[in-house]
Amino acid sequence: WSKSLAYRDDPRLAGFGFEHDSMVMPPREVGEAEQPPRLFIAALDALLGDLQASGMDTASIAAINTAGQQHGHVYLGEAARSAFASLRENAHQENLLTALKDCFAYGGAPIWKTANTTGEAEHIRKKTGGKAAIIERTGSDIPLRFAACVHRKLAGRYPQAYAATRHILQISSLIPAILVGDCTIPLDFGNACGTGIMNYRARQWDETVLQAVAADLPGGAVALAAKLPPLAHPLTACGTIAAYFQRRYGFSADCRIIVGSGDNPQSKVLASGDLLSLGTSFVYMISSPEAAIDPNGAANAMYDGLGRPFNFGCRTNGALAW
């Protein structure tokens, strides 16, 4: 069974301020690229509704794994924890949008097209000890689209939103968090590579990079670290599906939810060798027998959805521009 949503024409996905040609909300400055997180929530209900309408026996589904666009993330506020939990505790919610309407501390989800963080990237690189140092720690030379740059950008431009943020979730984590009704689930260490904050070899948040990202921000590195999720293997089960989805769509209470990963790490799962993807970005994924890092920073060191190391060369916006 396969199903996609025609987001341009589907009335269930209308009215979120999404520009179909650019695939982002109208930017407020050059290089800003954000999508409406409420669209992701509406799309999940729409997709599961279509799945149920197709006649699929949802009760027979034993586990769900997901992929989300790499680097994209959302900022959740104080109300998020109880709102997500309500999906477990109250099976009779009207819909996901209603249940989660007050969750977001910031109304946009910055995505991989972000290109307005040059100053933030240079700041983080310098504070970490320079190009060689940040590559050695994170496996990447802090590209503009990486979440570390965006967190600093948001904190400087929208300090109230940053202060109100309690949890930062990558888009790959948002969907499984909704499915289990828990916004404190782990982030897989594969997609954490695309944040620019994880120590690549240790597979933990890097304290030096945290200090660099949060330098001069309220609460410093301690406050930023508190907003980030714990890290886990990409195949970690983060719980069973929430009561809302059992009642509304017929899933079994035993259906397990996997923490998921980014779209690139999950694509790499398809090949044990190298993989060339000619999508919205042109990417070359090169298998590595160990956690190897390109000291020149031309490639990004990552892990795939099975936890295997690989290097990732990217021509951003490939098919959109060529």
Q: Can you describe what each PLM-predicted range is?
A:
Residues 14-31:
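A short small-residue
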Residues 9-10, 21, 69-71:
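Short active-site-proximal "capping" loops at secondary-structure junctions
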Residues 13-16, 239-241:
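Short acidic/His/Gly/Ser-rich catalytic and metal-binding motifs that mark active-site loops
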Residues 3-5, 17-19, 109, 313:
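Short hydrophobic alpha-helix segments
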Residues 1-12:
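N-terminal basic/disordered segments at the start of proteins
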Residues 8, 23-24, 306:
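Compositionally biased, intrinsically disordered/low-complexity regions enriched for serine, proline
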Residues 27-38, 42, 46-322:
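Glycine-rich phosphate-binding/catalytic subdomain of phosphoryl-transfer
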